[in-house]
Every structure is written in structure tokens, then in C-alpha cells.
């Protein structure tokens, strides 16, 4: 999880690599800044500006690393359909090794069927504990695998299903958290808009 090392921890790792031979660092750029702690500063922030994927790769190469972008690019969790959808919508390159099958399903026309199924894990942006259904926050789901997931979107992502959706206009940390949420399921991935869920939300709030 090389992407989780920030600031002094990152500098320590980089210093150690200059002293050791045959160092292999494994990580996913698109999962940085997802955790609630240790998610700011170097190497993914340059002052107040986000460091892009290309700039981060260039920095590693300038530091003497050979950067392998393909060996671990295939998901052992997500289906080809889900990986293709993520690549298309989020502009994040990900492919599937074909171990699992699953579809991307928008459920705005009939959301209660999925929301009422306990076997389907609901992934919300925050405050997961406030709901009666089994839910996890997007960021806390990192590293987990579920049989099927329902991602409840935020207001700013309500147009994810539109051809006009532009991931470049989404805050990088939010995009990374969405990427994490959308890659948790080994089966189907259900998506519901914030505008749809708001109409039903009160029925699922724990009292």
C-alpha cells in the first residue's frame, strides 16, 4: 500500500530505497487520500495543488525507479463489465482477469428492492452507522470484498450516468473514494443517485 505513505513516512521510504537493493513498492495511485487520516501532503500534494497520476509516475522515475504500470492492472475482484464502466466514466485504467461476472445496474426506477436486501452491501459517502441497512463509508470499504454492492452517490455525482459527465470536474479525493467504492463487488454493482435516495432516506434512518 505504497500510496498510503505520506510526508515524513514517504520520505523515510524513499531514503530507505536508496540504501537497499531490489526494493519493490506496490500501490494504487487512485486509492490515495481515501483514508480518514494521513491523507494530505507529499507526494500527492504540491503545496495546495494535487499531483496528477502522470506527474507522480514521472517523479518516481526521476527518483530512479522502474515503474511497472501493467503487471497488477487486472482486478481479481471486479467483472469485465464493471472495470470497463469505471475506465469509461472515471478515466481510470482498470481491467478484469475474468474470475467473476457482474453487471452495472442503475436502480433509480425501483430502488427499494436493492435497498431492502441485506445481502447487498450499501456504500455511502459518510455516516454509514446512521442507517438501518448494512452500510459502509466509501473510504472505510477500502480493501474489502463483498458479493454485491450498492453505491449511493453524492449530489455532485448525480450525472454519472450522463454522457456529459466529466471526472476532471470532480474533486480528486472524492473521485478516488468513488473508485474504491465501485471496485468492492465481486458480483453486481448497483448505483443509485443522491436525488433518488433523498426521497427514501428517512425510511432507512436508524432512530
Where are these regions (language model features)?
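Conserved helicase motor core of SF1/SF2 NTP-dependent helicases
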Residues: 1-116, 121, 125-180, 184-207
Amino acid at each position: 500500500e505504497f500510496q498510503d505513505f505520506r510526508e515524513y513516512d514517504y520520505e523515510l521510504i524513499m531514503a530507505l530505497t536508496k540504501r537497499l537493493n531490489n526494493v519493490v513498492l506496490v500501490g494504487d495511485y487512485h486509492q490515495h487520500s481515501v483514508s480518514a487520516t494521513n491523507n494530505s501532503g507529499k507526494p500527492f500534494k504540491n503545496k495546495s495543488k494535487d499531483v496528477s497520476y502522470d506527474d507522480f509516475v514521472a517523479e518516481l522515475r526521476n527518483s530512479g525507479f522502474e515503474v511497472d504500470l501493467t503487471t497488477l492492472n487486472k482486478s481479481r475482484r471486479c467483472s469485465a463489465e464493471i472495470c470497463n464502466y469505471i475506465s469509461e466514466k472515471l478515466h481510470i485504467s482498470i481491467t478484469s482477469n475474468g474470475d467473476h461476472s457482474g453487471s452495472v445496474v442503475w436502480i433509480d426506477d425501483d430502488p427499494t428492492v436493492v435497498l431492502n436486501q441485506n445481502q447487498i452491501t450499501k456504500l455511502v459517502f459518510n455516516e454509514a452507522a446512521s442507517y438501518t441497512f448494512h452500510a459502509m463509508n466509501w473510504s472505510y470499504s477500502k480493501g474489502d470484498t463483498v458479493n454485491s454492492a450498492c453505491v449511493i452517490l453524492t449530489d455532485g455525482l448525480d450525472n454519472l450516468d450522463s454522457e456529459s459527465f466529466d471526472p476532471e470536474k470532480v474533486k480528486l479525493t472524492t473521485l478516488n473514494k468513488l473508485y474504491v467504492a465501485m471496485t468492492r463487488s465481486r458480483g453486481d454493482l448497483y448505483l443509485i443517485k443522491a436525488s433518488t435516495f433523498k426521497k427514501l432516506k428517512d425510511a432507512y434512518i436508524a432512530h
